[in-house]
């Protein structure tokens, strides 16, 4: 009995010892290293007692750690699984997806250099044919479970780069999408430590642990969020390091180039004005020269009106950028204009620009459109002398109806267009009166605006009409630069309404001449005549004669023989309208540009932006300011008269002249000449 119990105890001990030796092998040190690299180290390792059965637990944990620490890379299966090649006639088995891919490319696709290139896929039932080896090797990735291209946002792997590119578009949120950095470049605040691990797309904006690289774009350093006492920052801090596609450098350089181009063109234009290189009295010459200044970035007036075609640069103020208390944006200064350096140059150029304005406003077409030289205006005052041009007289006779004028203030509106955009100025239809409504080419100093006439004698000539819209905002010079000078009567502003007809003549339609070829039908209806169908000519004459209407009584717009005539007339009218609109727009641009140039010159004169040294130099060399060789308060050069020296002999003079190799240096206080000899 005791022997049987001893045998049972021995078997039980052997059974208990066998699992520890076979089932739970001693773990190798490699899984422990992987475990320490992947999982955070515990605070204090617990001591392992020798009495507890540790080997089985340790083996289970090591196996789980090895499975987690070594996942299938690039989507390939575990090494224990074998992948079979399904190419036609091949039964090769590979241990990994990379090996299978290399096997297919080298064994079945081949190369042109080895004379075994195959461009037809024979994987299973696939018979895709390509034209290049690169194409078929890219196609083979569809059959092989190889996914080397991983998304850095969500960690999903793809077989081909084009599949990854399509997948990235699903993350296309403008606020969080960050493109992958180019090779060799470092994008601050957008770097993932350890490659894409499947973090959220917007997590890297606010977690300091994911921003190991300090910010390089702004001056406030790396963001420190969720802290009790943040470090001091300059004014207007940002709400996170967010990159905006502002492109300050490129836009600033382009803006500087465009402004410099306009600055140089304006300087050249002023030089041409000073040299009178084009006729100021020719509308065509003035328009051609002004064409070169349009659509350019001209200097911005300080506190004055801006041309409508010049966009105003908008300042950019975002968090972390330029703040009012910090460094401002880069400022550049253009060199002064060489052709407008003195005050005299500015005054002369202002006179030339005034003459150009007179030429623009006195253009025959636009003066006729304004009602100055219309055919119906037969009234000519006896006091007016005959003028060869259509321009208005510079002085009005005292008996003519005039308007009381008053000085107007400068307009501070940023645009220099007409205050009455759609409503023309309502003035009596007089050639002289229409040019006293603020449109005459007057100087900047003698600006006037229209007020209702206040006189007793001439008020009965014309009815009292309402004043122009926004008359108080009309500025000096040429404030209303609408399209062509609008008609001065109550008519519209379209070309069809500008037609003037001479009245006082009664007219009627021209009587139509009787057609002698049409004979009266005197035939009698009867069987003796014969029943026959009348010819087309006879039927047409019979049907047209009783209902025919005189062509002179039909509206010309309705009287057309065919539709082609109406279409051609419509096309002609449309073309004429387009030409008129284009001409009017060009005229408006010329007027606006001249107004801007005159405001620019006036602003420089008001601020004193001219060279004062030239004025002092002119005063220094003027003869009336000299008195006894110098003037008090003006610097004079040291041109002291030197006492005459005794004449040297010709031999000494010739020797001294031959030996001097440098110009003579004269002392300021001495009378002797210092000569430098070789």
From Swiss-Prot:
Residue spans with biased composition (Polar residues)? 417-448
Biased segments, Low complexity type: 7-25, 397-416
Is Calcium one of the keywords UniProt gives this record? no
Residue spans, zinc finger C2H2-type: 83-108, 119-143, 149-171
Cysteine pairings via disulfide bonds: none
According to its record, what are the GO cellular component terms?
A: cytoplasm; nucleus
Composition skew (Basic and acidic residues), residue ranges? 509-535, 621-645
What is this protein's function? Transcription factor that mediates regulation of both acid- and alkaline-expressed genes in response to ambient pH. At alkaline ambient pH, activates transcription of alkaline-expressed genes (including pacC itself) and represses transcription of acid-expressed genes.
The name of this protein is pH-response transcription factor pacC/RIM101
